[in-house]
């Protein structure tokens, strides 16, 4: 037999062996946190597409074999197995990722998306194990919290050692799972969604950019495009935390913007914010609304959010309140909240929610 024929035969045998090994695994049931597009094409494995921050997946099983399947060269993840130290998975691409040295027995697994990807999406193809493994019960949390906001809610550059960051440094040091939202939710063993995007506001984005968009125009969709409206009958958060206004008011108006005065911007912001909360309330009648804002911009943000709360309460929506936070060091990228700041904000929210009666 010619050498190249032998090489081809061996390659074919190895490929067949690899395919056989892949076919011998089975997908595990999983629990999804965050907005995810679940697709089940004919004769194809289920896929889970995402773009919003802080999405997570969980599974549990009894066995000793675990492989994660990715199709994502955009995001950074952390993998937590049995509450052990997290393992960082950096832009895995299209790959099968085996978990090494897994002992026989019961295991709980959690995969968390860390990074912000405003213009791209990624796909997770699931957790896989060997046929002899036994799936175990998935989390069935009764508590749900939704966080809606901008870069402060995203955790923009929150783990950076410096305020000065390149785009790549910003990407690598943004850890949405260390932002105040997930920290707060985990303290209550609550499922959570982080529906936030850096630079966006209620009616105006940072320095007037992308005037045809706002966080309110992005919010209705499952992904960062208008192809799929988000609907999940099981998502009924008892608490909705909104932090929007920094981008609306942190810069002066430009000549080409549609508001000719600051007062016109204020009125538009308040009217649209009130309308947005009312829409959320119509779908979540029991939800407690917390409108958070900093003391920045000489109190302008706090004043306008206060008007929103007053109008909502005046219209009969009483389960709404304002929290103004101060005292942050803003040592993250580009003067954003640091991981230490995020913990302070989480502590503020945790204490506040612990004092609320009957919200769960």
UniProtKB/Swiss-Prot annotation:
Source taxon at top rank: Bacteria
Coiled-coil features, chain-numbered ranges: none
Protein EC: 3.1.1.-, 3.1.1.72
Signal peptide: 1-21
InterPro entries named among the record's database cross-references: CE2_N, CtCE2-like_dom, PCW_deacetylase/CE, SGNH_hydro, SGNH_hydro_sf
Active site: 151 (nucleophile)
Catalytic activity: Deacetylation of xylans and xylo-oligosaccharides
Chief location category: secreted
GO molecular function, one term: acetylxylan esterase activity
Site residues (Increases nucleophilicity of active site Ser), renumbered to this chain: 336
Pathway: Glycan degradation; xylan degradation
Location in the cell: Secreted
Positions bearing the site annotation: Transition state stabilizer: 199, 247
CC per GO annotation: extracellular region
One GO BP: glucomannan catabolic process
Keywords annotated in UniProt: Carbohydrate metabolism, Glycosidase, Hydrolase, Polysaccharide degradation, Secreted, Signal
UniProt KW Secreted keyword: yes
PANTHER family, alphabetized: ESTERASE, SGNH HYDROLASE-TYPE, GDSL-LIKE LIPASE/ACYLHYDROLASE DOMAIN PROTEIN (AFU_ORTHOLOGUE AFUA_2G00620)
Family stated for the protein in its record: Belongs to the carbohydrate esterase 2 (CE2) family.
Protein's job: Involved in the degradation of plant cell wall polysaccharides. Catalyzes the deacetylation of acetylated birchwood xylan and glucomannan, with a large preference for the latter, and of the synthetic substrate 4-nitrophenyl acetate (4-NPAc).
Protein name: Acetylxylan esterase / glucomannan deacetylase
Organism for this UniProt entry: Cellvibrio japonicus (strain Ueda107) (Pseudomonas fluorescens subsp. cellulosa)
């Amino acid at each position: 037999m010619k050498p190249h024929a032998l090489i081809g035969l061996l390659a074919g045998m190895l490929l067949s062996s690899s395919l056989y090994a892949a076919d011998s695994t089975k997908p595990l049931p999983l629990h999804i946190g965050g907005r995810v597009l679940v697709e089940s094409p004919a004769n194809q494995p289920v896929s889970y597409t995402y773009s919003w921050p802080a999405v997570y997946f969980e599974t549990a099983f009894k066995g000793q074999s675990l492989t994660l399947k990715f199709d994502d060269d955009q995001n950074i993840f952390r993998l937590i197995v049995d509450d052990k130290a997290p393992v960082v998975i950096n832009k895995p691409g299209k790959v099968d990722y085996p978990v090494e040295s897994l002992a026989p027995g019961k295991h709980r697994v959690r995969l968390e998306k860390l990074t912000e990807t405003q213009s791209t999406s990624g796909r997770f193809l699931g957790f896989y194990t060997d046929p002899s493994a036994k799936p175990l019960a998935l989390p069935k949390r009764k508590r749900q919290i939704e966080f809606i906001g901008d870069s402060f809610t995203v955790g923009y550059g929150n783990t950076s050692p410096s305020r000065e960051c390149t785009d790549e440094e910003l990407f690598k040091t943004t850890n949405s799972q260390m932002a105040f939202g997930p920290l707060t939710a985990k303290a209550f063993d609550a499922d959570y969604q982080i529906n936030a995007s850096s630079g966006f506001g209620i009616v105006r984005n940072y320095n007037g950019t992308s005037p045809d968009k706002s966080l309110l125009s992005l919010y209705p969709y499952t992904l960062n495009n208008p192809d799929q409206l988000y609907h999940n009958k099981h998502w009924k958060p008892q608490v909705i935390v909104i932090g929007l206004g920094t981008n609306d008011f942190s810069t002066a108006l430009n000549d080409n913007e549609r508001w000719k005065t600051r007062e016109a911007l204020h009125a538009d912001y308040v009217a649209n914010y009130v309308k947005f909360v009312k829409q959320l309330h119509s779908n979540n009648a029991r939800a407690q609304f917390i409108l958070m804002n900093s003391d920045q911009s000489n109190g302008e943000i706090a004043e306008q959010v206060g008007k929103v709360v007053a109008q909502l309460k005046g219209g009969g929506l009483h389960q709404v309140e304002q929290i103004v936070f101060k005292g942050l060091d803003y040592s993250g990228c580009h003067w954003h909240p640091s991981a230490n700041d995020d913990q302070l904000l989480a502590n503020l929210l945790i204490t506040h929610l612990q004092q609320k009666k009957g919200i769960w």
